[in-house]
Regions:
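Hydrophobic small-molecule pocket/channel-lining residues, especially in calycin-type beta-barrels
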Residues: 18-183
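N-terminal secretory signal peptides that target proteins for export/translocation
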Residues: 1-3
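Bacterial N-terminal signal peptides
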Residues: 6-17
Length: 183
């Protein structure tokens, strides 16, 4: 089976698990799903040095994450600057909500690449945001999954994982715990 077909099937599975809005007790404005992330946060990042290699060597970074609403709240722009053992990170995420599809598209970039990656697409269900995309990594077609969870008014958790077997197994490679900065 082709890698694209595997990706489409994995995405279809994710979407089939989404609740039927017509059966919902009250309407949910999914365009505000990322409001918990707006503002300035301290971020502690753990990053797997060599993903999908069998290595379990991690490195850490600490820094600041800022996030502002754009497009009347139907999107947001996140910027991360962090320093650690392996140097300086500058990362950006552009999040856009498609009200017709009831899904978010997340476009990542870094100061290293200088371009937007293909989007991760997904939604929130029961307080967990799950987003998937297919990418090429070291010459291999992989799935990438991002999870946002444990959101409170002052903190949340993010985890990115790769799958080289089209979603059968996942290896976390970027984990961030964020705490809101006050003052």
């Amino acid at each position: 089976m082709s890698p694209i077909r595997h990706f489409v099937l994995a995405l279809a599975y994710l979407l089939s698990a989404a609740p039927d809005p017509a059966q919902s007790a009250s309407p949910h404005d999914a365009g505000h799903d990322f409001d918990f992330a707006l503002g300035t946060f301290h971020t502690h990042i753990r990053r797997l040095v060599h993903p999908l290699s069998g290595s379990n060597k991690w490195t850490t970074y600490d820094g600041t994450k800022s996030d502002v609403a754009i497009l009347g709240g139907q999107g947001s722009l996140e910027q991360i600057e962090a320093d650690g053992e392996k140097g300086h990170l500058e990362l950006m995420t552009l999040r856009l909500y498609n009200a017709v599809a009831h899904q978010w598209s997340l476009y990542f970039s870094s100061s290293k690449s200088g371009q937007l990656d293909s989007p991760s697409v997904g939604e929130f269900d029961n307080g967990v945001g799950t987003f998937l995309d297919q990418e090429s990594y070291n010459g291999r077609t992989i799935l990438v999954r991002q999870l946002w969870s444990a959101a409170t008014p002052d903190s949340y958790h993010f985890e990115q994982a790769f799958s080289a077997d089209f979603g059968k197994t996942w290896e976390a490679n970027f984990v961030a715990d964020l705490k809101r900065e006050h003052g």
